């Protein structure tokens, strides 16, 4: 296994734009690589996407592997899996990291199977141990336990990483790097699915990981109707609605809104927690937010210890006042 070196990331892009999670895991890969004294490689797949190579180098990549093919214009499981598998067999990375997006979650296990290696899904922490192995930490048993996993006997070591967990890499346009174009053997016969048309996501699709502003409701909203005022505040701020696990478990809102250790990990510029007490599982999913505002009628709620600003009061009286004041500023 001495032939394997370097830490790679799958640089996920959609419509020619790098996803935030790609920049997040690139920053983490840079830290891990510096600890091991190896290079960071970024795998960029698509068609006419080579222009993103400079961005990846500026964010910390030493080498960008570009697989450009018209058949890879849109994501397909077979095409992307074959391209990355061929690339990994040729250059032998020690580690490959993917964002735990719907693409990453579909792609990573297919590559793990092709390369006959292991995969740890939904990681919230990564490190290097004294033997140089990748330590992969993820929630287990419903978020009540954090498990740290190693893959000592297979290469590459592979993980998917939750969006929002890692801090975005800092851009440095003075960095230099290398671009390697790789001609993967991709044919139409390799791809079993054909894309006939693409429909843009409906506006009501929740995208917590990419949101700059999140307004979340907890048990204190009293029931499913309580989310009406949460949504009203989110709308006036141009944000999205989040939720605690308790409200999801109670059936008040769908699970795609859930923030926390067993939900989504977020890092918005502004996070407003309404009627959320501050259980450790919830805090684990939003504690890295830029600014945290807590609204709770219990002055002893744990959430206030983590909030930048706290409002003690009935959220059904406080939020309407906030909404009116925000509207006046517009």
UniProtKB/Swiss-Prot annotation:
FAD binds at residues 270-298. One of its GO terms (molecular function) is flavin adenine dinucleotide binding. GO terms for biological process: fatty acid beta-oxidation using acyl-CoA dehydrogenase. The keyword Electron transport applies. InterPro entries: DHS-like_NAD/FAD-binding_dom, ETF_a/b_N, ETF_a/FixB, ETF_alpha_N, ETF_asu_C, ETF_asu_C_CS, Rossmann-like_a/b/a_fold. Binds 1 FAD per dimer. Its cofactor is FAD. It holds the Pfam family ETF_alpha. The keyword Protein biosynthesis does not apply. CDD domains: ETF_alpha. Heterodimer of an alpha and a beta subunit. The electron transfer flavoprotein serves as a specific electron acceptor for other dehydrogenases. It transfers the electrons to the main respiratory chain via ETF-ubiquinone oxidoreductase (ETF dehydrogenase). This is Electron transfer flavoprotein subunit alpha. It comes from Thermoanaerobacterium thermosaccharolyticum (strain ATCC 7956 / DSM 571 / NCIMB 9385 / NCA 3814 / NCTC 13789 / WDCM 00135 / 2032) (Clostridium thermosaccharolyticum). The gene is etfA.
């Amino acid at each position: 296994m001495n032939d394997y070196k370097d830490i790679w990331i799958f640089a996920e892009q959609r419509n020619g734009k790098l996803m935030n999670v790609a920049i997040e895991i690139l920053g983490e890969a840079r830290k891990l690589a510096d600890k091991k004294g190896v290079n960071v490689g970024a795998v960029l797949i698509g068609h006419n996407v080579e222009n993103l190579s400079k961005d990846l180098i500026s964010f910390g990549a030493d080498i960008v592997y570009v697989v450009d093919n018209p058949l890879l214009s849109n994501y397909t499981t077979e095409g992307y899996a074959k391209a990355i598998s061929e690339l990994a067999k040729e250059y032998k990375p020690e580690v490959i990291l993917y964002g735990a997006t719907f693409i990453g979650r579909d792609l990573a296990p297919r590559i793990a199977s092709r390369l006959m290696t292991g995969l740890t899904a939904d990681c919230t922490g990564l490190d290097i141990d004294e033997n140089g192995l990748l330590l992969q930490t993820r929630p287990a048993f419903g978020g009540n336990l954090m498990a740290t996993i190693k893959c000592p006997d297979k290469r590459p070591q592979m993980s998917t990483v939750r969006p929002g967990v890692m801090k975005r890499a800092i851009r440095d346009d003075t960095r230099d790097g290398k671009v390697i174009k790789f001609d993967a053997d991709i044919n139409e016969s390799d791809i079993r699915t054909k894309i006939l048309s693409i429909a843009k996501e409906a506006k009501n699709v929740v995208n917590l990981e990419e949101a700059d502003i999140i307004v979340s409701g907890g048990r204190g909203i009293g029931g499913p109707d309580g989310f009406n005022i949460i949504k009203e505040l989110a709308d006036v701020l141009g944000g999205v609605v989040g939720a605690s696990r308790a409200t999801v478990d109670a059936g008040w809102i769908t699970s795609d809104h859930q923030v926390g250790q067993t939900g989504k990990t977020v890092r918005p510029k502004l996070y407003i927690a309404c009627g959320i007490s501050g259980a450790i599982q919830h805090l684990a999913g939003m504690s890295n937010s830029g600014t945290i505002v807590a609204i709770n009628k219990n002055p002893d709620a744990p959430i206030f210890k983590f909030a930048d600003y706290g409002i003690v009061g009935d959220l059904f009286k406080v939020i309407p006042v906030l909404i009116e004041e925000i509207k006046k500023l517009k």
